[in-house]
Amino acid sequence: MTITVVSTFHAPVLSLYGQRFVNSFSENIDADIKLRLYAEDCNPVTKDPRIQILDAKQKLPKLNAFKSTWGNVPKANGKCPPEIKARRPKDWHKEFKWDAVRFANKVYAVFDAAQHCNTDWIVWMDADTFVHSKFDYAAFKSFLPERSWLAYMGRGRKWPECGFYGINLKNPVGLEFLKEFEHVYEHAEYGIFRMEEWHDSYVFDEVLKKIKRKYPNEPINNISGNLVNGEGHPIINSGLGAYIDHLKGDRKSVGKSNKPKDLIKPRNESYWTN
């Protein structure tokens, strides 16, 4: 089974965490797993032949078109529309929930990789990930069961954690999910903007619900097991935490998840105990 990891970042974060992600991937992830990285206005450095660095602006024309159409439209850039604001008095000010343009960088990288990678699985991994321990092929593959069409981080009733997910490109349901996922972005006015929120995780969840209704018996691997407590930081509290850290929010400036409530599951890996 072949596996290709996909990620993207832009110039402002290269020195903060982007280059560190590339270095940790090269050092700790099995040599049989590839990385396809879309870099925007920056030049990450690596001598690792399995890491392919692409110019995001050149390789993602659909993303460019999306930004051209929606880049100056307030509702697509974090400004909650009045009709939603009226029924969301507690969270309308949380701009990330309606910032479609910001999070489109992630999804269009996935769409492009799915079309151009000759691989069995594509795995999205946020670039604010740090691979802290050796992650061999068998361990990585264990999160991607061959019979499953999707591996993801569920959070119960909340939208999934989309810092890590895998799609089986050899499974027709996985391909249908990708097709629908891209469709709601390519036809955004009647797609994502008909939803209640339009950050990538919410859109992912809406498409996932639709596909699950259509194929209720097709296997999916929920890596997190629907964590109820600590659902804000599920990656490090799942099996993935033995290998990677996810530097969400202001953890990026610290370089490690070290908040008191980050780990709800005791870990004995040296990265976490030192």
Model regions and ranges:
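A structural signal for well-ordered alpha-helical segments within the folded catalytic domains
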Residues: 16-19, 104-108, 198-206
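GT-A fold catalytic core of metal-dependent nucleotide-sugar glycosyltransferases
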Residues: 98, 102-152
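Catalytic core and acceptor-binding pocket of nucleotide-sugar-dependent glycosyltransferases
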Residues: 170-274
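Short acidic-hydrophobic catalytic motif
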Residues: 95
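N-terminal anchoring/stem segment of glycosyltransferases
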Residues: 1-92, 115-118, 169-172, 247-254, ...
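Conserved catalytic core of nucleotide-sugar-dependent glycosyltransferases
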Residues: 132-201
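Short, well-ordered beta-to-alpha junction loops that form the rim of enzyme active sites
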Residues: 41, 127, 223-225
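Short beta-alpha junction loops
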Residues: 39-44, 129, 155-156
